């Protein structure tokens, strides 16, 4: 009987622990994993910049994530600064650039690389494409059509995506 109660308490503890883990926000995750080496831009600010048409936006996720959906006009640059389809040498070093990934962790790494290469106006999208979609902004598929599909990276990170269809 004591063993059954003990097992029940362990299961109950694990359930509440898992629930608490799932409730951790993007804010908390970024505080834990980022070092703020690249200035942030909010999803609202990025939307305004995109309407003006004066910003380059780089998707720093894996190719399969980019193929599911992306922010309008985002260029694929990948996690390892894939410049096959983009030459950084021809870009103005003062050109406004925004990097993003799922929530803003991988994009901070690529933002640091761009800053080290001499780019002076690089920002990291706070909350990445997940917060972008959670706030109701559109994402687009490979054919530049609006889509509800978002590559959620994996089930652990996908818990931070509250809007759209999660694709794994």
Predicted regions mapped to residue ranges:
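Residue-level preference for short coil/turn positions at secondary-structure junctions
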Residues: 51-53, 93-94
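Bacterial N-terminal signal peptides
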Residues: 6-17
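Structural motif
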Residues: 56, 96-98
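Gly/Ser/Thr-rich loops at beta-strand to alpha-helix junctions
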Residues: 102-106
């Amino acid at each position: 009987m004591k063993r059954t109660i003990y097992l029940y308490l362990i299961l109950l503890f694990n359930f509440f622990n898992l629930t608490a883990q799932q409730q951790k926000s993007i804010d908390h995750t970024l505080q834990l994993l980022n070092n703020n080496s690249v200035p942030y831009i909010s999803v609202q600010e990025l939307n305004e910049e995109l309407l003006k048409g004066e910003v380059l936006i780089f998707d720093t996720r894996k190719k399969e994530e980019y193929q599911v959906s992306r922010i309008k006009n985002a260029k694929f640059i990948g996690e390892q600064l894939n410049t096959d389809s983009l030459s950084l040498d021809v870009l103005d070093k003062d050109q406004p650039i925004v990097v993003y990934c799922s929530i803003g962790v991988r994009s901070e790494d690529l933002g640091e690389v761009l800053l080290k290469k001499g780019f002076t106006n690089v920002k990291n999208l706070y909350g990445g494409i997940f917060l972008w979609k959670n706030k109701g902004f559109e994402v687009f598929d490979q054919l530049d059509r609006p889509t509800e599909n978002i590559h959620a990276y994996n089930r652990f990170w996908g818990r931070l995506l509250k809007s759209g269809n999660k694709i794994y």
